[in-house]
């Protein structure tokens, strides 16, 4: 992946916010924001960033202007709290689906240091899991399933507590005072994870068939239509409007699948599947939970630790996904993914 210093990040944010700019306009914006830098240095930085693929240059000589590329969007460091704290209609993000996003998506999302941290966690996970007895293995699996089903459902607004979820999965006892759909959602998570664990080889690659298969398990009994949605869908708290054409949605899924197949590591594949499914919103309901389970399916199929999201803050999760919807920046969510992967590798031993 490309390396960007603090000044280059500042330039990316300005062009992401303002659109196509010439070097003098970038210099003016940086000066307004308190940066002391010469126009010559700005021109040098812009030229270097265009060469590295973070920017696209248009025109020649004095007429040269710059706009942000897909790679630049993906790696612009957008602060989740600062961005989502702005009213939706005042934010500078995209309103509509970016057709260039997946065809041009980088093959490497994580830098060398991040890959090193993730690899160390994976090695620890393998060591813990290797010599686990069948009895302990079953207990570990059940603990993971309970915590994943609880937290993934909670992110969706489910009000079951962790103890409620444990009783439901272990003893088949529903919590009093809760809607039946809440219990169904949790049990569907359990069934979906166990299904992908038993059919890992089917999930080494992402495609429409296994997307619809996984979604069908997650929405069983919830009154949600299976398959690609045929109507409009809106995103609460966001001005981003997903595709509303069935044929374009299918093409977007195919494009996402190709991007996932190009991704360098299982970490890259899993993260891209999660944000990609959430971004396309191909399903009538349950897109984000399908994305979370698809990410786990890809990790499991490559022998990596699945994520429970137990320690994630739900608002941070939702906010970071929203940043990706509107700006296509993966930086905020990548940090969540990395933290949750390391947490999972350290706390579970799912064989």
Question: Locations of the language-model features?
Answer:
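FIC/Doc superfamily catalytic core
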Residues: 1-351
């Amino acid at each position: 992946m490309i390396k960007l210093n603090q000044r280059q990040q500042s330039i990316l944010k300005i062009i992401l916010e303002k659109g196509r700019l010439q070097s003098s306009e970038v210099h003016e914006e940086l000066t307004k924001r308190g940066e002391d830098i010469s126009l010559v240095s700005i021109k040098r930085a812009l030229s270097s960033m265009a060469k590295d693929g973070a920017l696209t240059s248009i025109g020649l000589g004095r007429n040269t202007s710059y706009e942000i590329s897909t790679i630049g969007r993906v790696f612009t460091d957008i602060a989740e709290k600062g961005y989502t704290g702005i009213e939706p209609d005042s934010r500078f993000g995209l309103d509509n689906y970016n057709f260039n996003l997946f065809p041009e998506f980088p093959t490497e999302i994580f830098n060398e240091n991040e890959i090193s941290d993730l690899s160390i966690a994976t090695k620890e996970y393998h060591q813990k899991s290797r010599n686990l007895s069948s009895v302990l293995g079953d207990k570990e699996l059940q603990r993971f399933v309970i915590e994943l089903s609880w937290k993934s459902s909670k992110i969706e607004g489910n009000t079951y507590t962790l103890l409620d979820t444990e009783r439901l999965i272990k003893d088949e006892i529903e919590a009093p005072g809760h809607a039946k759909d809440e219990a169904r959602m949790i049990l569907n998570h359990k069934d979906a994870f166990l299904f992908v664990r038993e059919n890992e080889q089917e999930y080494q690659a992402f495609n429409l068939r296994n997307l619809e298969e996984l979604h069908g398990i997650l929405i069983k009994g919830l009154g949600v239509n299976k398959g690609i949605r045929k109507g409009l869908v809106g995103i609460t708290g966001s001005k981003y409007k997903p595709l509303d054409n069935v044929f374009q949605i299918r093409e977007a899924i195919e494009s996402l699948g190709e991007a996932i197949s190009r991704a360098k590591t299982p970490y890259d594949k899993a993260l891209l599947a999660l944000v990609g499914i959430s971004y396309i919103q191909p399903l009538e309901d349950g897109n984000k939970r399908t994305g979370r389970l698809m990410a786990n399916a890809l990790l499991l199929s490559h022998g990596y630790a699945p994520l429970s999201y137990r320690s994630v803050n739900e608002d941070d999760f939702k906010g970071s996904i929203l940043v990706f919807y509107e700006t296509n920046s993966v930086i905020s969510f990548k940090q969540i993914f990395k933290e949750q992967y390391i947490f999972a590798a350290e706390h579970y031993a799912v064989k």
